[in-house]
């Protein structure tokens, strides 16, 4: 992971974000599985994906990008490459990944969070290549972005609103 402009490790901020989001989701009646319960856990992306596939209805990986422009939030979309989108399990799940990503961006945007471009960037990720559940990598800003407790609460509300929308609540 990257390091924020003030020297804070991304893993520290994503763990704080995950705890704030967990509280928001629990308050809305969701069950929440944290793939890691410390600021830095050595699990590769395949292990994280397998854990999520076997124990969850959706997998949301929280990140901040390594750029330095406070560019806003976006999700990593499944590349628009027919040979990639036709492989399993991608073929059976990429549309779910995309719908979840769009819902999260809409939730964030509705809560006043700055969105980068269209809110989507194509990326071939292990996470979406092997997921059998709706799965998304969401970038919540970059190394210049605000990650104060107040900002994390706004981000968590936006993400939770997106999850509600995705699941029809």
Segment roles from a protein language model:
Residues 1-7:
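Short glycine-rich His-centered loop
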